[in-house]
Each structure stands twice: as C-alpha cells, then as structure tokens.
UniProtKB/Swiss-Prot annotation:
Self-association and partners: Part of the 30S ribosomal subunit. Forms a bridge to the 50S subunit in the 70S ribosome, contacting the 23S rRNA.
GO annotation, cellular component aspect: cytosolic small ribosomal subunit
UniProt GO BP: translation
Entry keyword set: Ribonucleoprotein, Ribosomal protein, RNA-binding, rRNA-binding
Record's keyword annotation contains rRNA-binding: yes
Biological function: One of the primary rRNA binding proteins, it binds directly to 16S rRNA where it helps nucleate assembly of the platform of the 30S subunit by binding and bridging several RNA helices of the 16S rRNA. Forms an intersubunit bridge (bridge B4) with the 23S rRNA of the 50S subunit in the ribosome.
Similarity section: Belongs to the universal ribosomal protein uS15 family.
Entry protein name: Small ribosomal subunit protein uS15
Superkingdom of the source species: Bacteria
Species assigned in the record: Alcanivorax borkumensis (strain ATCC 700651 / DSM 11573 / NCIMB 13689 / SK2)
InterPro entries recorded: Ribosomal_uS15 (IPR000589), Ribosomal_uS15_bac-type (IPR005290), uS15_NS1_RNA-bd_sf (IPR009068)
GO molecular function annotations of the record: rRNA binding; structural constituent of ribosome
Entries under HAMAP family matching the protein: Ribosomal_uS15_B
Length: 89
C-alpha cells in the first residue's frame, strides 16, 4: 500500500527535474499515481474498506488539481507527464 523509500527514490530520479526535486508537479503527480495504484490493488481484496477509499478519493482529487495546474502553466510538460504515466485525460 504505502511506498517504500526505494520506490520513492526511483520515482524522484525518474520524474525529478533536479537530483533532490520533491516539489515539482511532475514528482508529486508521479508519487500520487503510485499511491493510487497501490490502493486500487488493495480494494480488490477489501471492498468494504470505506475509510481508505476516502483517502483514495482525496489523492485522486489532489492529483487532478496538480495536473490542471501543470496544464495551465506548461502544456508540453503536462502532455509528456500524462504520456509517461499512462494517464488518460
């Protein structure tokens, strides 16, 4: 469910603009996407876990807001990111 330190470091290295970049929208969206994918797998076996589902919805909304921000500020970075992550928008 939660990402390990190694998984986070791999995402930072792959999507970061600099070495220790944790604040750029690309990194934040990639981390949220990894968490969302983990929670979706969790719900396949725990259908009635509504408490975690609330957290999932919150993460999806946060990712949507960050993607909207990135699309408004820099359309090319936005298009590259959704293609790299395989998001449909």
């Amino acid at each position: 469910m939660a990402l390990t330190v190694e998984q986070k470091a791999e995402i930072l290295k792959e999507h970061g603009r600099k070495e220790n970049d944790t604040g750029s929208p690309e990194v934040q969206v990639a981390l949220l996407s990894a968490n969302i994918n983990g929670l979706q797998d969790h719900f396949k076996g725990h259908k009635k876990d509504h408490h975690s589902r609330r957290g999932l919805i919150r993460m999806v909304n946060q990712r949507r807001k960050l993607l909207d921000y990135l699309a408004k500020k820099d359309r090319t970075r936005y298009l590259q990111l959704i293609e790299k992550l395989g998001l449909r928008r």
